[in-house]
């Protein structure tokens, strides 16, 4: 039985396995009669993937779903190749970049692109968060590629295949030349790799989008109404501009309310740089600098305490819980700074946090968008209380012990 990749035409997630197949020299058949929404709902398909997602690879030994898993399987079909590295450390680094490009790059591109296409609800703050996270990831990738042609070693590996396929979604949809020009080494890397023969066989002639797609509008899906009355020329002509105006109307609302607050003498990015760049004498330099900068009129400080600490019996589960919270806070990165302390040498671990937010209250869009907020008790800091002020300083500098307990970990959101 030949390998069969069940997917629809143009599925960018399926391209990873097809490119890997070119490198290892194996044949993969792609059925031409696959219909999304039909074929993937059949009993035969659901036996291969119970939730009906594509792509799915059918092999003589069984089926495999999830695009990265499929690409990994294909890359190992012929052992005489370098796609998985030549040593254990190279293999680990390949896996590292696969995870990085999937979790940091691809996920952020989807969160930017998806809402604009109507695949999920659009939120301006959420889009800002996605773009901010994507830029941070691309900046890290750009730094690595400053002195490296490929991600691992001196030839193309599976990490390059998956990363470039992930980048290709962004280049094709939302990442314009103006956007990617901030990351010249990423640009060089992307165009070098997509023009390799084994890539062009699958991807064809890759082009970069010239514009970010407009936000999908429900009203845009109703152009048939004017066409139903073609003889009444005056009505459609008069109504068409109104439709356009209605579609344009949401654009001013995209402005985040926090951007409309009176200017603050505290520049959040200046504080974040001071925090990151202070390597010694932290209390004398960074903490003193924070209080010199802090503007209680333009910003507010908040303590948070996890409500269900008795559940935090396993260290890595607790750390993952906090890490997930910080990931979901990405939409607020422009307007906030946070420290999360995981306290205790054994379970149950206590999770305590300190957050700096733009404005006098916790921004409403954060409360609405980040479900984790409800899992914490929030208390506004009274900086006139020297004990509370000292607690803020200790949390910023990861003082240990903190309130009589060792620190399992301290995470910074900046």
Swiss-Prot record:
It comes from Arabidopsis thaliana. Residues 214-224 have a biased composition (Low complexity). Residues 1-82 form the GST N-terminal domain. EF-1 is composed of four subunits: alpha, beta, delta, and gamma. Residues 254-414 form the EF-1-gamma C-terminal domain. Keywords: Elongation factor, Protein biosynthesis. One of its GO terms (cellular component) is cytosol. The keyword Protein biosynthesis applies. Transmembrane segments: none annotated. Probably plays a role in anchoring the complex to other cellular components. Gene3D superfamilies: 1.20.1050.10, Glutaredoxin, Translation elongation factor EF1B, gamma chain, conserved domain. This is Probable elongation factor 1-gamma 1. Residues 87-215 form the GST C-terminal domain. SUPFAM superfamilies: eEF1-gamma domain, GST C-terminal domain-like, Thioredoxin-like. Residues 225-236 have a biased composition (Basic and acidic residues). Residues 214-260 are annotated as: Disordered. Coiled coil: none annotated. The keyword Cell cycle does not apply. GO terms for molecular function: glutathione transferase activity; translation elongation factor activity.
């Amino acid at each position: 039985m030949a390998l069969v990749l069940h997917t629809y035409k143009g599925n960018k997630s399926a391209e990873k396995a097809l490119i890997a197949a070119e490198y290892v020299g194996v044949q993969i058949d792609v059925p031409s009669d696959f219909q999304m929404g039909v074929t993937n709902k059949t009993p035969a398909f659901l036996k291969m993937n119970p939730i009906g997602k594509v792509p799915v690879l059918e092999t003589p030994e069984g089926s495999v779903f999830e695009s990265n898993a499929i690409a990994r399987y294909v890359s190992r079909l012929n052992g005489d190749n370098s796609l998985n590295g030549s040593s254990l450390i190279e293999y680990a680094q390949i896996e590292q970049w696969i995870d990085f490009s999937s979790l940091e790059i691809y996920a952020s591109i989807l969160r930017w692109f998806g809402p604009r296409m109507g695949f999920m609800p659009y939120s301006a703050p959420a889009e800002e968060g996605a773009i901010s996270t994507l830029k941070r990831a691309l900046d890290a990738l750009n730094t690595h590629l400053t002195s490296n042609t490929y991600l691992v070693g001196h030839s193309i590996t599976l990490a390059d295949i998956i990363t470039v396929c992930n980048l290709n979604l962004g280049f094709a949809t939302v990442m314009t030349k103006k956007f990617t020009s901030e990351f010249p080494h990423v640009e060089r890397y992307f165009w070098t790799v997509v023009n390799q023969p084994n890539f062009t066989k699958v991807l064809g002639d890759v082009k970069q989008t010239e514009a970010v797609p407009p936000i999908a509008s429900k009203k845009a899906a109703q152009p048939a109404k004017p066409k139903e009355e073609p003889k009444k020329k005056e009505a459609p002509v008069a109504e068409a501009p109104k439709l356009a105006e209605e579609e344009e109307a949401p654009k001013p609302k995209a402005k985040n309310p926090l951007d409309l607050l009176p200017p603050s003498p505290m520049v959040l990015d200046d504080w974040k740089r001071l925090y990151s760049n202070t390597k010694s004498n932290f209390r004398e330099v960074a903490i003193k600098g924070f209080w010199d900068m802090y503007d209680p009129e333009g910003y507010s400080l908040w303590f948070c305490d996890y409500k269900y600490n008795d559940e935090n019996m396993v260290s890595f589960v607790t750390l993952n819980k906090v890490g997930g919270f910080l990931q979901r806070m990405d939409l607020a990165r422009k307007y906030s700074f946070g420290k999360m302390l995981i306290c205790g040498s054994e379970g149950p671990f206590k999770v305590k946090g300190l957050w700096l937010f733009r404005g006098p209250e916790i921004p409403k869009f954060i409360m609405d968008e980040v479900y984790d907020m409800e899992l914490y008790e929030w208390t506004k800091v009274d900086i006139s209380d020297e004990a509370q002020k000292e607690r803020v300083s200790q949390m910023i500098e990861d003082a240990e012990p903190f309130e009589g307990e060792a620190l399992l970990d301290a995470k910074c959101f900046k």
